[in-house]
Amino acid sequence: HFNFMNCSYNEYHIAETSDYAVDFHKNNPKVKLIKYDGKNLPYQNETFDRIIISHCLEHILSPEEFIQEMMSKLNKGGVLSISLPTDPGLAWRLGRLFIRFFTIKNTYQISGEEFNYMNATEHVNSIFNLISIIRFNYKNSYEEHFYPLRIKMSDFNLFYNVHITKRD
């Protein structure tokens, strides 16, 4: 999702667990790529002013630990920005239904059943649980947004974005 980020930093550090993703970004001169184990980010604590996580937490088995690891790498006052799909919200399910019937079969040559299986095994955390983890652990430190309707309800939106500021 890096190509859809609308930021103008001089340098980006991308930590990936996937060889495919590392290969995808290797020709961008602004990007410093590292491959990592998905648990321990190989940077010293208090290194970054901003960390952006786009569509990752729904795939991670221990999202609370992952967020804590990211927060440890932020400078005081730094911001962790997280973007998530609102899976299994109603709007997300309707979007998946549309994709399943009109895109998946033609583009990826897989059945709807295979598509559902892929999502079930890859999206191990629901948006409802992830929001609860964020709200509980970062009270008074976060600003959240729902898109496209901007109503604070996961069922009626496709994406949840949150910015957590490191206070201590």
PLM feature segments, named:
Residues 61-75, 79-167:
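S-adenosyl-L-methionine-dependent methyltransferase catalytic module, highlighting the catalytic core
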Residues 1-90, 160-167:
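Conserved SAM-binding loop
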